[in-house]
Amino acid sequence: MSGDGGHSPGDDRPTRGSTYVVGDIQGCFESLQALLAEVGFGDADRLWCVGDLVNRGPDSLAVLRFARNLGDRFACVLGNHDLHFLAMVYGGHPHRATDTMESLLAAPDCLELAEWLRCLPLLIEDRNRLVVHAGIPHVWTIGMAREYAREVEAVIQGPGHAEFFRGMYGNEPALWRDDLEGMDRYRATVNYFTRMRLVDAEGRLEFSHKGTLDDLPPGYAPWFSYPMQVAGTLYFGHWAALNGATGQARIIGLDTGCVWGRTMTAVRLEDGATFSVAAAEPSP
C-alpha cells in the first residue's frame, strides 16, 4: 500500500529517475521485490538502503546478488548484520543460533559478495541528505562523523580487514573520546554508526534496550532526542521497535520491522513520498 496520500507510483517523477531509500531488508527478498513493484521501480531509478541487507530473513543471498547487480544505481551503508556476516567470512566468528545465512555462506560467490559488501561506507552524504544505519550521536558534528567513518572504512577496505573483524565485537569503550586509538577507536565508531539506540547526555552508549520509547533506563534517551549538530535530513534504520516514529521531521526512521512480520518501507527522496508493503516472509 502506498503511504503518500494516494499519490500513484511514478506520478511527477523526474525524467532522470528517482531515488528510493529503503529500510532494513535483512534477507527479505520477496518483500523487497514487492516494494519495488509498488513504487514502480524502473531502469532509471536508484535504490539506497540504510543497511542490514542480510540475516534473520530467508534469502540474504538473493538480496546481495540483486543489490550488486544494480551497479551504480545502488548505494547502501553497512549495518551491524552486514558487519556480522563479514566477521564470519574474514574474522572467523561463529554462526549464531539466530543467523539465517547458511545458503549465503555456502554459495560459490560468497567471497565475491563479501568483497563487494566490505566496500560499502558507514555514511552516505548527498547534498543535504545523510544515510546511516543506527544514527549519529549528538556529540559529533557532521565533519567528525565524516572523518570517523572514513577512518573505519579505510581499515575495512584495506589489508588489515581480517584483524579488524577479529576485534570488532564488544561494548567498550561506550563513551567517545577524541584521544581513542586503534581498535578501541574503530569499535566505538562502529558501535555509534551501527548499534546505537540510546545515549546519555555525554554520548555514552546503552546497548541493552531494544524496545519502544516506554520504560527507558534512567539517564538515557534516544540518540535523536538530543539537539543535533547535523543539518539536513537524516535517514536511518536499525531500531525496528520504533516502527519509523521519531517525532523529528528531519530524522526519518525506515526500519518498520519487515523481518518481524510487519512492513518494509521506502521514501522517495525527490518528493518525500512514503511507500510500504506488508511483509511477504513469515516472521522468525
Where are these regions (language model features)?
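N-terminal active-site segment of His-dependent metallophosphoesterases
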Residues: 1-70, 83
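A short acidic-Thr-Gly-centered motif at the start of a beta-strand
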Residues: 5-15, 40, 67-69, 121-125, ...
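Active-site-proximal beta-strand elements of phosphoester/diester hydrolases
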Residues: 19-26, 129-135, 253-254
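Active-site neighborhood of phospho(di)ester-bond hydrolases with catalytic His/Asp-centered motifs
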Residues: 22-23, 47-51, 76-79, 234-237, ...
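Divalent metal-coordination and catalytic microenvironments
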Residues: 24, 52, 67, 79-80, ...
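Active-site environment of divalent metal-dependent phosphoester hydrolases
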Residues: 26-30, 55-58, 81-87, 138-139, ...
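Acidic, His/Gly-rich catalytic cores of divalent-metal-dependent hydrolytic chemistry
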Residues: 146-284
